[in-house]
Amino acid sequence: MTYRLALLTAAEAVRRREELIALCAQAFGGSPWHEPPLGAVRTVDRLLDSAVRRDDFCAYAAYAADDPDDAGAALLGFVAGWTDTALSGGEPTFELVELVVAPGSQGLGIGRALHDGLLVAGAPGPALLMTLDVPELTDRYTRWGWKVVDRLRPGKEERDYVVMRRA
């Protein structure tokens, strides 16, 4: 399968809301997340609400490139980030906020390409992310150069999360 990456503005991401919800529902419905479909709506709406208020919102989408004119190309993956202080304890730091790949497109290098594209386009310096504290996720990010710097259980969550840093 071939794919292409496209940089998305916040406005473009908002226009693709329904596609993003469908993608997140597919990806987060299974292991290790096991989120209900409404979780995808909440995730996307929270991300887009924040995106439109940020000057440094950065996002890439991966589309199937099998169609020569890319008309109606399927959304295979998405990544977004911005500079924030939420995970750093007050120091403005670029945060990888969301990385999602459709289950049928996982294992093809799409997630890594999205990840790398975002980090190149994002603010220079170290970056942070927060993800579930499960080997399936932490091992992947460790292979990609991230290190666990904190473990926590935010708010009303029943699951443990890690904060990871990449220099």
Question: Which residues fall in each region the model found?
Answer:
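Conserved N-terminal entry element of GNAT/NAT acetyltransferase domains
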Residues: 1-18, 22, 26
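Helix-loop element at the rim of GNAT/NAT acetyltransferase active sites that forms part
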Residues: 21-38
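Active-site rim helix/loop that mediates acceptor-substrate recognition in acyltransferases
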Residues: 34-68
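Conserved beta-strand in the GNAT
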Residues: 59-61, 70-84, 95, 100
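Conserved acetyl-CoA binding element of GNAT-fold acetyltransferases
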Residues: 89-103, 129
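Conserved acetyl-CoA-binding loop-helix of GNAT-fold acetyltransferases
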Residues: 101, 107-120, 142-143
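Conserved GNAT acetyl-CoA-binding A-motif
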Residues: 120-133
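Conserved catalytic-core motifs of GNAT/GCN5-like acyltransferases
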Residues: 128-130, 142-163
